């Protein structure tokens, strides 16, 4: 889908660039595949703010997305492509031969009327799901599982994908968008193709209000605060903070490595940081 630019009738439209969604379904989602979604405002179960600068935003309905794709060897037809406010990608409504309905992440080049199927030995075409062990090397995939049966976790955002670059002792070697190469069990399912809406990275909100509509409040810099609120706060006139960047709680940030998951280090063959050297 293309990008839309506007004549600057108002200041907020001068820089505005949005994705043209005219090709998507304009009605409401399937009621049986949705549930209510309450606003958290960045607060946890005790009512304290755990994520700053969140709150407000337009009301949403949550759509249940089938990330597992375990309805094997049952052909489904794409009924329509829909917008989903809870993610950057578009979603596709699938009607299976037995009458069941499901939402899946829509890959690029998937159109209304196309057939999709999940199975151990199915065609390599966009929207089909199969184990990584069944795919030819070089295949572009998305919605990749990290544990068999857990559901897709990798490459689910708009325009993202991973590439199967090799195999090693029952494991598949994937190259991710970040440049990282990692091992994933060959029994893990993945969907063929890249995720839809690749132009998402080119949008320009044009005004602060659009971020507020999404539930994002103004992100205040530490140097603009008082000393009581942030380690960078205070000072006479404008200051640069006077120390290496830290979080409001004094921990180093902006480039400081924070990864501490030693148990999965063995699955990372090439770090995403090596690419930059």
From Swiss-Prot:
What this chain does, per the record? One of the primary rRNA binding proteins. Required for association of the 30S and 50S subunits to form the 70S ribosome, for tRNA binding and peptide bond formation. It has been suggested to have peptidyltransferase activity; this is somewhat controversial. Makes several contacts with the 16S rRNA in the 70S ribosome.
- Key words of the record: Ribonucleoprotein, Ribosomal protein, RNA-binding, rRNA-binding
Region feature (Disordered): 222-277
* One Gene Ontology cellular component annotation held by this UniProt entry: large ribosomal subunit
Q: What is this protein called?
A: Large ribosomal subunit protein uL2
The protein's gene is named rplB
UniProt source species: Brucella anthropi (strain ATCC 49188 / DSM 6882 / CCUG 24695 / JCM 21032 / LMG 3331 / NBRC 15819 / NCTC 12168 / Alc 37) (Ochrobactrum anthropi)
Molecular function in Gene Ontology: rRNA binding; structural constituent of ribosome; transferase activity
| Superkingdom of origin organism | Bacteria
The UniProt entry, under PANTHER family, shows: LARGE RIBOSOMAL SUBUNIT PROTEIN UL2M, RIBOSOMAL PROTEIN L2
Entries under SMART domains matching the protein: Ribosomal_L2, Ribosomal_L2_C
């Amino acid at each position: 889908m293309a990008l839309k630019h506007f004549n600057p009738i108002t200041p907020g439209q001068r820089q505005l660039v949005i994705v043209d969604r005219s090709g998507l379904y304009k009605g409401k989602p399937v009621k049986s595949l949705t549930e209510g979604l309450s606003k958290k405002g960045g607060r946890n179960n005790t009512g304290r703010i755990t994520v700053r600068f969140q709150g407000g935003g337009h009301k949403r309905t949550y759509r249940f997305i089938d990330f597992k794709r375990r309805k094997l060897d049952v052909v489904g037809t794409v009924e329509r492509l829909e917008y989903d406010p809870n993610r950057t990608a578009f979603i596709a409504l699938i009607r299976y031969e037995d009458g069941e309905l499901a939402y899946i992440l829509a890959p690029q080049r998937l159109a209304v009327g196309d057939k999709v199927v999940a199975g151990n030995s199915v065609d390599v075409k966009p929207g089909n799901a199969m184990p990584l062990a069944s795919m030819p090397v070089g295949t572009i995939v998305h919605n990749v599982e990290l544990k068999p049966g857990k559901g897709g976790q990798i490459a689910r955002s708009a325009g993202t994908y991973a590439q199967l670059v090799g195999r090693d002792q029952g494991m598949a070697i994937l190259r991710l968008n970040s440049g990282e190469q990692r091992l994933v069990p060959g029994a893990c399912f993945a969907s063929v193709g890249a995720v839809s809406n690749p132009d998402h990275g080119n949008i320009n909100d044009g005004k602060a209000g659009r971020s507020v509509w999404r539930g994002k409040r103004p992100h205040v810099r530490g140097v603009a605060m008082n000393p009581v609120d942030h380690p960078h706060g205070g000072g006479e006139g404008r200051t640069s903070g006077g120390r290496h960047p830290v979080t409001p709680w004094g921990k180093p940030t902006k480039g400081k490595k924070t990864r501490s998951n030693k148990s999965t280090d063995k699955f990372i063959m090439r770090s995403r940081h090596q690419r930059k050297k």
